[in-house]
Amino acid sequence: MAFPRVRLVVTADDFGYCPRRDEGIVEAFLAGTVTSVSLLVNGTAAESAAELARRHSIPTGLHANLSEGRPVGPARHNASSLLSPEGFFLGKMGFREALAAGDVALPQVREELEAQLSRFRELLGRSPTHVDGHQHVHVLPGVCQVFAEALQAYGVRFTRLPAERGVGSCAWLEAPARAFACTVERDARAAIGPFSRHGLRWTDAFVGLSTCGRHMSAHRVLGSLARALEDIPAGHALTAELMAHPGYPSVPPAGGCGEGPDAFSCSWERLHELHVLTAPTLRAWLAQNGVQLCAIDDLDSKRPGEGVPL
């Protein structure tokens, strides 16, 4: 398949979740496929992950978390709309349900985001290269506005826009996963306005919703890129991001963000992604199709190209 000129960022999410996860992420980075990582500052291994990032000079951003584990901000010590009675975030769907019901106080969201940005600076000694959202919370209605405000206040320019073209037609996705991916895509498109108004940048194309876990293969990554880049004029230079979740499976009770590792973290699917990313097939296919791997901080500080279809 013939691509236009493409620079691809491959981001490994959930850095800091547990040492075994981090071991796999670093392995994929050293293999040359993963080019960027997103750190969970409330992860149980956040401090050791930060040391790994420094040791290996890994471009590192913040994986803003409002849905799993314990907070790092004022909510730790006070009653908060973000937390369950047990003091944990409400979960991927629980947070969405509370937000839709109007039960989430957005000023508390802003406080937690700023606390995580500050914690990142404490751990790494610098600002994040980018900020995205754990379980895509950053593009949710209302949250996307305070998220954009917080990033602007902290001088962060790059984020992720998880709008993957054609994800609704990916028949290999189970119905619940496909429905969730379509909802994320819809929310991402609605977040473009707030993100743009606050000067945020993101890649021209995004893939990863359709290639998560067991669904990742070199063939599907290339196919997702092809869909994302359809109708791009010849000679147009493009940027794209592949979201990935590589790592060795967590072994309970180690890992997580304060309440232990989740099922996906403990499954073989993380290891499957690691194998796909470190095998020579994917890198060879990308190179054959003119795709150049790069880090997020290698990209031009400009908004996505005009005329690029979303």
From Swiss-Prot:
Enzyme Commission number(s): 3.5.1.-
One BP term from GO: carbohydrate metabolic process
Highest taxon of source: Eukaryota
Pfam hit, one: YdjC
Disulfide bond sites: none
Keyword Acetylation part of the UniProt annotation: no
Cofactor(s) this protein requires: Mg(2+)
Binding site for Mg(2+): 14, 134
This protein's UniProt keywords: Carbohydrate metabolism, Hydrolase, Magnesium, Metal-binding
Residue positions of the active site: 13
Family (UniProt): Belongs to the YdjC deacetylase family.
Protein function: Probably catalyzes the deacetylation of acetylated carbohydrates an important step in the degradation of oligosaccharides.
PANTHER family: CARBOHYDRATE DEACETYLASE, YDJC DEACETYLASE FAMILY MEMBER
Record-given protein name: Carbohydrate deacetylase
Organism encoding this protein: Mus musculus (Mouse)
Lineage: Eukaryota, Metazoa, Chordata, Craniata, Vertebrata
Gene (UniProt): Ydjc
